[in-house]
Amino acid sequence: MVGIITRKYIYKGWNKKMYEVFADLHVHIGRSENNKPIKITAARSLNFANIAKECRDRKGIDIVGIIDCASPYVIEDIENFLKTGEAYEIKDGGIIYKDKVCIILGSEIETSEKGLNGHCGSAHNLCYFPHLEDIKGFSKEMSTHIKNITLSSQRANISAYELIDIVEKYNGILVPAHCFTPHKSFYGNCTDRLEKIFKEKYSKIPAIELGLSSDTFLADTISELESKTFVTNSDAHSLPKIAREYNKMLVGDISFNELLKALKNEDGRKIITNYGLDPKLGKYHRTYCEVCGKNIPGNAPVTVCNTCDSKNITMGVYDRIEIIKDKEKTKSPEIRPEYVYQIPLTFIPGLGKKTIDKLLDNFGTEMNILHKLSKDDLEAVVGEKTANSIISAREGKMTIQAGGGGVYGQVKAC
């Protein structure tokens, strides 16, 4: 058994103990160790080694998916990281860092799709692989379909229908990314049904990523998603944003194989809780008028600005789902885990960097602060007002102003 000897014991079955672990499966890399650009919009400090350390020392994340590992620069960093002895690959897939964190090697690929009304659309796909040799092979093959394989989230000259075969060739799985956002997603600008994209291969997809502007209650108004596991991930472009959304899983160990079983709900492995932002905090929750420069009020779906009559809008996720849903009311399958609205520490009014650092120095990880500590524990370190804010955020008692048009929503103090 690797890396989880301190995890909470749940029950014994299949001759194996089961554990609750936290997973964030969508974290970007900003720069390589040699300062080569990977994700242009991501922080320079966001490199492979720093992500592993952040997850272990500050966030309390047990499984992290780093989705820029197909870049040759990152592959070189991984090889050098393994040589330090701080991390090692395991047979069941994944890289274990200091016996605490399992790193899943991934790649975000933008595919070219026949979009809505015949126009050319594009969507992001999260591709995960068990071993370094698998992603090295994937990287080499994808370099024939992508102009610059060294950069993150580059557009390939193939469709997702074709991509999934290449992913499987290298023992990987494909998960559609932030499925509802207006840019670079399947439901947002390519289709009203994933089955139209993947056709007979649709059953090969174990899960979809909800994205920051949606949640289980919105997604479960679409019938074809009843068979898919929902994952909530951070899409982090900086170290502090890791685990702004995450999943609690029940697994027998931390590895690629155990993660895959959890996504497929096999052998008792499963996601037991999705922790996500209230979708109103997302950047694209409501429709935004590009002329007026503000969200458009009114009942969804909003497709025209009711102030200036402009159609120059960025469609909101909530509005888009209202258009494509095929259920009048949300109805989730019995296997669907609980969705818990989560406000990260960085979103809570009054919590600056110094206060967050003080909390982490005293209590270890963000998971401890968000889930486990009592008000008295918090108050002893940061005072009554800040402790009340953290508890209010935990209990969903804060007011939220909806985001849209690429601008995050805002949390208002009670």
Model-identified regions with their sequence ranges:
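Extended substrate/RNA-proximal surfaces in nucleic-acid metabolism proteins
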Residues: R7-N15, E20-A23, N34, I75-P206
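Histidine-centered catalytic micro-motifs
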Residues: F22-S32, C69, T232-H237
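Acidic/histidine-rich helix-loop elements
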Residues: I29-S45
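Divalent metal-dependent hydrolysis catalytic cores, especially in the metallo-beta-lactamase
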Residues: K53-V74, I173-P176, A207
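Short acidic/histidine-rich active-site segments
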Residues: K228-R244
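Cys/His-rich short segments
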Residues: K270-P337
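C-terminal extensions
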Residues: I296, Y341-F347, D357, D376-C414
